């Protein structure tokens, strides 16, 4: 879902040097995540995508050290589980019509009728961090 990497990280899929083919989903996913030029450089020219290149196109969330990565993971883990599940379902959908799939719509409805949404409103009113339970 999210990629966190330090400044020395790099990414490479050496299919051309190994002589095998990639499925269409993987090729198009690389294009969507990296952009056409970087995906071509990585797949066709067998080039590494550096952390700075990956960060520039939003492929990674750059961090300076493991502690910063852990802090980021901790902050994400504190977010509302139902909202996260609905967002991930909608973001991963293959439908380009901008309509929510039936699964994403059901999760949307569950999120808005959950106790988590009530807790978020209450916590905001009380100026405190919400405590989510995924219900």
Identify the meaning behind each predicted range.
Residues 1-42, 57, 68, 72:
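CoA-thioester-processing core
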Residues 4-9, 55-103, 115, 132-135:
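C-terminal long alpha-helix characteristic of the crotonase
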Residues 20-21, 44, 114-118:
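Transmembrane alpha-helical core positions of polytopic small-molecule transporters
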Residues 26-29, 38, 83-86, 104-107, ...:
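Hydrophobic alpha-helical segments typical of transmembrane helices
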Residues 42-43, 90-94, 107-112:
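Helix-loop "lid/cap" segments that line or gate small-molecule binding pockets
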Residues 46-53:
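Acidic, divalent-metal-coordinating active-site segment for phosphoryl/phosphodiester hydrolysis
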């Amino acid at each position: 879902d999210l990629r966190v990497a330090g400044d020395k990280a790099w990414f490479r899929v050496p299919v051309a040097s190994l002589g095998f083919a990639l499925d269409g989903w993987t090729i198009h996913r690389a294009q969507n995540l990296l952009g056409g030029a970087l995906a071509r450089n990585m797949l066709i020219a067998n080039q590494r995508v550096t952390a700075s290149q990956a960060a520039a196109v939003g492929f990674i969330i750059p961090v300076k050290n493991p502690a910063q990565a852990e802090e980021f993971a901790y902050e994400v883990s504190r977010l509302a589980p139902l909202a996260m599940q609905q967002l991930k379902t909608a973001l991963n959908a293959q439908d380009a019509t901008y309509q929510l799939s039936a699964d994403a719509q059901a999760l949307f409805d569950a999120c808005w009728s959950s106790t988590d949404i009530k807790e978020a409103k209450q916590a905001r009113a009380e100026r405190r961090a919400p405590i989510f339970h995924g219900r």
